[in-house]
């Protein structure tokens, strides 16, 4: 069921056709499933267990929703794209159409946990977005944010997706200033991808422009199996904060009482 809060120009954040056209491919890609498992582990590690309610902000293709539903969390997905919400809608799934650049209606539910995974890099005002989300979080709620990292890796792939920026730990921490959330930890993820992305960036500097689907194309087997194994290998290291670099950064923050 889709509830309506507000609408806005979805294509300004990420081309809506890209979301729709790549749904099947994303749901099979190891990166999205590994990220969802990491977010689930973070919720558990910070004391957020069912029946605590979760809001997945920028739920997109629904990979996080499936992971949390399988873990028996009552979860709601929020996205600006009506088209993608209609594609992932299920009779017992709770979805909200809303524009993060606008305020939210009164009388809404308060959530114990919130996911904001690879969202704020699409928005001009990252801090303002987090600040607007604060009233949706109950006191002590956990907010998990992920972003693409290392500005020197900014490439055509970022442009295609509608990314405004890539982050460093300090710039990610600054996005929480004055928002009502206190950052508890920031850590790297995807360290094994960094040299690959560096090579890809150099290779495609003068190449023919590519599409989002081109970048999502998985290499032949057994490469996808190897990718899954690398994410499993890195999972605990990322959670422990022992990685020294990565293609992504995660932040875990707590709503002030």
What is each PLM-predicted segment?
Residues 1-117, 127-130, 216-220, 224, ...:
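Conserved N-terminal segment of class I S-adenosyl-L-methionine
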Residues 23-25, 143-165, 169-174:
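Short, glycine-/aromatic-enriched active-site segment of Class I SAM-dependent methyltransferases
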Residues 84, 104, 151-153, 192-193:
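Feature marks short, surface-exposed loop/turn motifs that line or immediately flank catalytic pockets
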Residues 118, 122:
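A short His-aromatic
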Residues 127-142:
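A short glycine-rich, Lys/Arg-flanked "PGG" loop and its adjoining helix->strand segment in the class I
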Residues 181-191:
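Conserved S-adenosyl-L-methionine
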Residues 193-228:
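C-terminal helical/coil "lid" or tail adjacent to the Rossmann-like core of SAM-dependent
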């Amino acid at each position: 069921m889709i509830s309506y809060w507000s609408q806005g120009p979805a294509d300004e954040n990420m081309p809506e056709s890209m979301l729709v056209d790549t749904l099947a491919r994303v749901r099979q890609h190891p990166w999205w499933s590994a990220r969802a498992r990491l977010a689930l582990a973070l919720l558990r590690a910070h004391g957020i267990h069912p029946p605590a309610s979760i809001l997945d902000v920028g739920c997109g293709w629904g990979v996080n929703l499936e992971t949390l539903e399988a873990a028996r969390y009552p979860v709601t997905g929020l996205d600006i794209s009506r088209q993608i919400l209609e594609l992932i809608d299920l009779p017992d799934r709770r979805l909200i159409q809303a524009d993060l650049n606008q305020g939210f209606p009164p009388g809404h539910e308060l959530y114990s946990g919130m996911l904001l995974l690879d969202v704020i890099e699409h928005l001009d005002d990252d801090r303002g977005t987090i600040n607007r989300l604060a009233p949706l979080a109950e006191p002590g709620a956990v907010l998990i944010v992920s972003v693409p990292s290392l500005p020197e890796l900014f490439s055509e792939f970022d442009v295609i997706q509608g990314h405004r920026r890539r982050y460093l730990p300090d710039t990610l921490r600054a996005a929480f200033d004055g928002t009502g959330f206190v950052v508890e930890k920031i850590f790297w993820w995807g360290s094994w991808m960094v040299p690959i992305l560096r090579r890809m960036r150099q290779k495609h500097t003068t190449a023919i422009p590519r599409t989002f689907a081109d970048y999502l194309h998985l290499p032949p087997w057994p490469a996808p199996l190897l990718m899954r194994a690398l994410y499993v290998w890195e999972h605990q290291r990322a959670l422990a904060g022992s990685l020294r670099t990565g293609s992504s950064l995660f932040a875990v923050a707590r709503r002030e009482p």
